[in-house]
Structures are given as C-alpha cells and as structure tokens.
C-alpha cells in the first residue's frame, strides 16, 4: 500500500512540475509534510479561489421613472434642466428634447395664473431638478415665486442676446435712415443740383452718371409715397372719429325694436334672420325676403296676442285672489266675523279664530253667508 501511494504521489508531482514549475510543487510538498493527512493542503491567505469582483460603474437611470436605460429606453438629456431621461419620460418638440416636467412648465409660458393651476408636486419637481431647495416653501405661492425668480435668473442670458440683437438692429436702422435722409430730406438741394446741371455745358450734362439720376428720382417717388400714406392714415382716423360706433360691436336686432308691422318692411335680411333666430324660429327654407317678412309679421302678431292674454290672466288672478281666504288662501270667503263684521276668512278658518286678523277684536261668532 505504501509503495502504491508513493508511486501515485510521484506521478502527481511530475504532472504539477510540468504545469506549474518545480518551485510551486516544492512549496506544496512542504505543506504536505506539516499536514496530518497525505492529501491535505495548508491554506494560503494570499490566494483566493474566487475571482475578484468586477468594479461596477455608476448605474445611470432615468430621473423620472428610475429605470435603467436600454435599447427600448434610450437616454436623452433635457435641454432645460440638463438631466438624463428616457425616451418615455421626455418630449420632443421643435427638435428640442425636454422632460415632462420642464415641458409642462414651458407650456404655461411662466405666467403666474397658469403656474397656480399646476400641481404642487410638479412645481417641486421642477425646482428639485435644478438643485433648488424647497424646504422653506410652505405654500403653493412660495413655489411659484421661486420658479419665477429662478426663471428670471436663467433668462438673463437670453435677455442679453436679445438686447444685443435689438441694439444691432437699432444701429442698422439708424445708418439706413441717415443714408436715405441724405437723399430724401434735402429735396431743395437736389433740385438746385439739377438746375446747375441744366445750366452747365453740354459736356457737364453728359458727364452726370445715370446712377445719381436714378437715385434722385427714386428719392422723390419715396417722398410722394410717404405723403400718400400719411394722407390715408389721416382719412381713416377722421372716419373713426366721425363714426365711433363702427369700431364697437354691432347690436343685434330684437323683436322689441319693432313698434308696428310697418317697421318690418324696412329691415334688412340680416336683421330679420337675427330676430327669428333670437325667438327660436326656423328660417332654413326661406329663399326670399318676403318669406322672412311674413314669418316676422306672424311672430310679431303672436307676441302681441300673448302679451294681451297674459295681462288678462294677471287681472283675473288678482280678482280671484281678492275672493280667497286670507288665512288658508284656498277656500272662498264665505264667513262674517261678529261683532266687527269683517269678511276675510272662510267658515272653517273663521270658527278657529279667537280675534279678527284685521282689527284684533274678540270674535263672538262666525256666521256663514251665501252669495246671491
């Protein structure tokens, strides 16, 4: 048994020498010598059987939904807050990618009434994305003020660029106006210059360049056009001053504007249709004006009849109310209260009265009466 174990150990050592080298096998053999068994190894603290853990990079996720970016959720950077968002949580508008929060506030144009309609969480999320603390905000107005303040600071660069562009445009317009004024304003100088040219020699007249003459004529035509435009503006202003009601909204015609049937004939088709439309009369089948006139006449007559019948009903109702009991307002007055003699109640209510409701006199008896 010992010889077999020795031969097997020798073969293993030879294989290890071929693979790892002689020094490694000798180190292993020294470990075997100190061990209690023939196949036990001493633990090496510098050697680990597990591979080293790979260093994990920063896990970049979407700021809105918290999911990792993938093929279906591509990474996009918001042009306002400069944060990373996926394609689902961002909106593409005018070739600019914005997150849903920035897009929501951008739609309000940063107007206070529109911002007050938003939710508190949207305003708070907008400020958090820009690393603005919101701990001191207790009301919604505080968040809106903070958003407006931050937007004003953030738009200073835009204001600078716009002011630069405006200054450039002002300078360009100044030079343009000064250039044209040199040709348009001194019209007398131009005319005198033309007179000198006409009085001069033939050589001097022929030596005048055609470009100068064209500039002179164009300047004169521009002066005439400006004068015509000013005259037109003055005429429009005078017309508005004379007829101030034209600029206001025109009052629609109604049935109350008619005093008699003769007024219907003098109304236009538009006014007739307005009257019919306001009184819920269908005029879709009317092709001629006389058809509209007939409908308006019929409507006017029916309105007059309704007013008369309504007045008669009110009169009858007043008369009926005069004959009703003043207590129950249901039965007819058919009782006389004694000793005062007032007739203000029915028999049923008169028997229950202890005193007259008019003179407050004690009721001795309630007598039922019949009308002849």
Curated annotation (Swiss-Prot):
Pathway membership: Protein modification; protein ubiquitination
Chain intervals annotated as zinc finger (RING-type): 325-360
Compositionally biased spans, kind Polar residues: 201-220
A GO term from the CC aspect: cytosol
Spans annotated as Disordered: 194-252
Site, as annotated: Cleavage: 231-232
Keyword flag Ubl conjugation: yes
Subcellular location field: Cell membrane; Endomembrane system; Nucleus; Nucleus speckle
Gene3D superfamilies, sorted: 1.10.720.140, SAP domain, Zinc/RING finger domain, C3HC4 (zinc finger)
Keyword set, alphabetical order: Apoptosis, Cell membrane, Cytoplasm, Membrane, Metal-binding, Nucleus, Phosphoprotein, Repeat, Transferase, Ubl conjugation, Ubl conjugation pathway, Zinc, Zinc-finger
Topology versus the membrane: Peripheral membrane protein
Entry keyword Hydrolase: no
Function of the protein: E3 ubiquitin-protein ligase that regulates several biological processes through the ubiquitin-mediated proteasomal degradation of various target proteins. Ubiquitinates the caspases CASP8 and CASP10, promoting their proteasomal degradation, to negatively regulate cell death downstream of death domain receptors in the extrinsic pathway of apoptosis. May mediate 'Lys-48'-linked polyubiquitination of RIPK1 and its subsequent proteasomal degradation thereby indirectly regulating the tumor necrosis factor-mediated signaling pathway.
Free-text note regarding domains: The RING-type zinc finger is required for the ubiquitination of target proteins.
Protein name, as recorded: E3 ubiquitin-protein ligase RNF34
Annotated organism of origin: Pongo abelii
Source organism phylogeny: Eukaryota, Metazoa, Chordata, Craniata, Vertebrata
Gene: RNF34
């Amino acid at each position: 048994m010992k010889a077999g174990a020795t031969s097997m150990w020798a073969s293993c050592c030879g294989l290890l020498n071929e693979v790892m080298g002689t020094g490694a096998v000798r180190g292993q053999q020294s470990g075997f010598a100190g061990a209690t068994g023939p196949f036990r190894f001493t633990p090496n603290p510098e050697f680990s059987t597990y591979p080293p853990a790979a260093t994990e990079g920063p896990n970049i996720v979407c700021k809105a939904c918290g999911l990792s970016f993938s093929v279906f959720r591509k990474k996009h950077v918001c042009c306002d807050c400069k944060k990373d968002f996926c394609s689902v949580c961002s909106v593409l508008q005018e070739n600019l990618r914005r997150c849903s929060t920035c897009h929501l506030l951008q739609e309000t144009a940063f107007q206070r009434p529109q911002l007050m309609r938003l939710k508190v969480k949207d305003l708070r999320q907008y400020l958090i994305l820009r690393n603005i603390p919101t701990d001191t905000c207790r009301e919604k107005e505080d968040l809106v003020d903070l958003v407006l303040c931050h937007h004003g600071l953030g738009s200073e660069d835009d204001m600078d660029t716009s002011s630069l562009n405006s200054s450039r445009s002002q300078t360009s317009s100044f030079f343009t106006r000064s250039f044209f004024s040199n040709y348009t304003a001194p019209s007398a100088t131009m005319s005198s210059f033309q007179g000198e040219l006409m009085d001069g020699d033939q050589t001097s007249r022929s030596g005048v360049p055609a470009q100068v003459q064209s500039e002179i004529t164009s300047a004169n035509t521009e002066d005439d056009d400006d004068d015509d435009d000013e005259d037109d503006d003055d005429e429009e202003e005078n017309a508005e001053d004379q007829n101030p009601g034209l600029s206001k909204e025109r009052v629609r015609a109604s049935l109350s504007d008619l005093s008699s049937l003769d007024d219907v004939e003098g109304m236009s088709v538009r006014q007739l249709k307005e009257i019919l439309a306001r009184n819920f009369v269908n005029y879709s089948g009317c092709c001629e004006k006389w058809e509209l006139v007939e409908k308006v006449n019929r409507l006017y007559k029916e309105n007059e009849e309704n007013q008369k019948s309504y007045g008669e009903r009110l009169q009858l109702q007043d008369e009926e109310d005069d004959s009703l009991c003043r207590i129950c307002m249901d039965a007819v007055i058919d009782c006389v209260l004694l000793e005062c003699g007032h007739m203000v109640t029915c028999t049923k209510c008169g028997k229950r009265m202890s005193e007259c409701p008019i003179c407050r006199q004690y009721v001795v008896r309630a007598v039922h009466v019949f009308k002849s």
